[in-house]
Structure formats: C-alpha cells, structure tokens
Amino acid sequence: MMNEHSIDTDNRKANNALYLFIIIGLIPLLCIFVVYYKTPDALLLRKIATSTENLPSITSSYNPLMTKVMDIYCKTAPFLALILYILTFKIRKLINNTDRNTVLRSCLLSPLVYAAIVYLFCFRNFELTTAGRPVRLMATNDATLLLFYIGLYSIIFFTTYITLFTPVTAFKLLKKRQ
C-alpha cells in the first residue's frame, strides 16, 4: 500500500509532465504565428495549406493561410496526448474512491463526449467569420485567432488525455474494491 506522500509525489511528476507537454504542444502555434507575422506569404505555410486543402478545417476568411495551417496542426493534439498517456500511465495514482455508478457512467459517457468534440473540431469544415458574434469578432484579428487555436489545441489535448485515462481509472477503482 502506498502512502499519501508518495501518491502526491507521483501525481506531481505526472502533472509536471502534463504541463511540459502542453507547452511543447503550443510552441508550434506560436511559431506559425511568428512566421506568418514576419512573412505573410511564407512558402512553408503555403505548401502546408495546399497539401492539406482537402482536409476539413476550421478557418477564417480574414486570414485563410494562417488559420488553415494552425487548424491542421491542432489535429495533431491527440497524438501528443497519446504519447503523454503512455509516459505517465504508471506514474499517475488514484487519490480518492468513488462509487461504482459514477465509474460506469464516466466509462460510458466520456467516449461519447470525446467523439462529439473530435467530430466537431477535427472532421468538419467551419468558417469562423460566419459564427456567432464573439467568434466572429475573434476571427478578424490575428492575435485573437492565435488565442482561439491555442484554446482549440488545449481542448483537444486535454479531452484526449482524460478519455484515455478513464478506462484505466475505472479498472483500478473496480479492482481496488474487490
């Protein structure tokens, strides 16, 4: 049986890895923004956008090149979350017990919520300038577009990571009860 201090230490290590991975994951978005800001007609960005033009994406007609490349990069968030999951699988420990109904509900509902999020953000075309007022206002400024894509990447990353841990957590909780 592990004591509380070692559980806290292990979870702190897993959380530090989580913070490091999300920062590493967001750096390319900042690089895309800087490259576009310095040279709006950058060959690298154009090449990425044209080679992925058939993929569905969330773009803004105000800035189609930068938003296309940022959206394509946001589609890589599940892969980085999977790598993090593999690295922190044995480190992260459970803190408290929950009842069996909550565990089963989370096992059934979290994949459905994740599937809806991934479908909406990764497999549909969406024009930001035709959305509701707050999003439409964000879509007309490069800095707010960067914030939008940072949020999008973070949402996809964290929901993937949480969804990957749900069955493991359920298994550990149910195993602990027996």
From Swiss-Prot:
Predominant localisation class: membrane
Membrane topology (Cytoplasmic) = 1-13, 90-105, 166-178
Q: What stretches pass through the bilayer?
A: 14-37, 69-89, 106-123, 143-165
Q: Which Pfam families match?
A: Colicin_im
Q: What is this protein called?
A: Colicin-A immunity protein
Source species: Citrobacter freundii
Kindly give the membrane topology term recorded for this protein. Answer: Multi-pass membrane protein
**Subcellular location, record wording:** Cell inner membrane
Question: Which InterPro entries does the record cross-reference, listed alphabetically?
Answer: Colicin_im
